[in-house]
A protein has these predicted regions:
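Bacterial signal peptide processing site
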Residues: 22-25
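Internal, hydrophobic beta-strand segments that form the core of beta-sheet-rich folds
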Residues: 126-138
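Short coil-to-beta strand junction motifs in C2/discoidin
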Residues: 70-76
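Post-signal peptide N-terminal segment of mature Sec-exported envelope proteins
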Residues: 29-51
Length: 138
């Protein structure tokens, strides 16, 4: 399983935060997976500065995978403290990367495909620095 996520999936967890009212992107960041792979014990951290209070945000993550990724899906555990800086909300999410026939979902070119995973929404009550933590469940 160690090599499962090596070189064939890039979690660009471009953890996107979009203001619900006007579709403006509040935060977008990219992290690639090391060439030695994404180990089960590895966590991706995204530190998100929020300048507005009482903002309703739509949350999503983007994943890029190469066509040699051996599985149709990926499970992600996503934690964030957007609604209260001292309380963590955690969800386990499933992203279907390919259909049953092996056709990749999302958009792509050549052997690279990108899919978007909606995470949900959150109300940020105070400006501040917030964090996303993402691990895989494969």
């Amino acid at each position: 399983m160690k090599n499962l996520l090596r070189n064939s999936i890039w979690i660009l967890l471009a953890t996107c935060l979009t203001a619900a009212c006007n579709e403006n992107t509040v935060y977008h960041s990219y992290q690639s997976i090391p060439t030695e792979g994404w180990k089960k014990s590895d966590t991706l951290f995204f530190n998100v500065p929020i300048k507005d209070s009482l903002a309703l945000l739509q949350l999503s993550a983007e994943i890029r995978n190469e066509s040699n990724y051996a599985y149709r899906n990926i499970y992600l555990t996503v934690s964030h403290n957007l609604e209260n800086s001292t309380v963590w909300k955690t969800d386990t999410l499933l992203l279907i990367l390919a259909d049953k026939e092996g056709k990749w979902n999302g958009t792509g070119w050549g052997s690279l495909f990108q899919s978007t995973l909606p995470i949900g929404s959150a109300i940020v009550r105070h400006p501040g620095n917030y964090t996303f933590k993402i691990t895989h469940g494969m």
